[in-house]
Amino acid sequence: MKDWLDEIHWNSDGLVPAIAQDRKTGRVLMMAWMNREALSLTASENRAIYWSRSRGKLWRKGEESGHVQKLHELRLDCDADVIILMVEQIGGIACHTGRESCFYRVYEQSGWKTVDPVLKDPDAIYPAGH
């Protein structure tokens, strides 16, 4: 029997884009990367675990902020190269800027406009030096 992780088309760095979507509202919350270990742990722990390219390590979403993403469903696209995580966003904040979603800017007439409010000051979310 083929391992379900072998069905993923990983990029040349061994990563796959992972989109977190609110399971109730359908809103796209964020996009991050997963390696094989992150995806396997996400499935087994029922919470979003990503691969931080900048830190070069696993990143358990909410480990510092408390804004955990509880996994309800994993979906794989038709080309097997993008994952969607249907999640419950604990605390209502997915973005490190303190907003509900990382997609808080809208293109309007040749520029980007911020349309979503900061729900919590990032300095109040993350420890000093983050």
UniProtKB/Swiss-Prot annotation:
Entry EC number(s): 3.5.4.19
Chain sites annotated for binding Mg(2+): 77, 79, 81
Location relative to the cell: Cytoplasm
Any one Gene Ontology BP term: L-histidine biosynthetic process
Binding sites annotated in the UniProt record for Zn(2+): 78, 95, 102
Keyword annotations: Amino-acid biosynthesis, Cytoplasm, Histidine biosynthesis, Hydrolase, Magnesium, Metal-binding, Zinc
A molecular function GO annotation: zinc ion binding
Catalytic activity: 1-(5-phospho-beta-D-ribosyl)-5'-AMP + H2O = 1-(5-phospho-beta-D-ribosyl)-5-[(5-phospho-beta-D-ribosylamino)methylideneamino]imidazole-4-carboxamide
Assembly information from the UniProt record: Homodimer.
UniProt function note: Catalyzes the hydrolysis of the adenine ring of phosphoribosyl-AMP.
Annotated family: Belongs to the PRA-CH family.
Protein name per the record: Phosphoribosyl-AMP cyclohydrolase
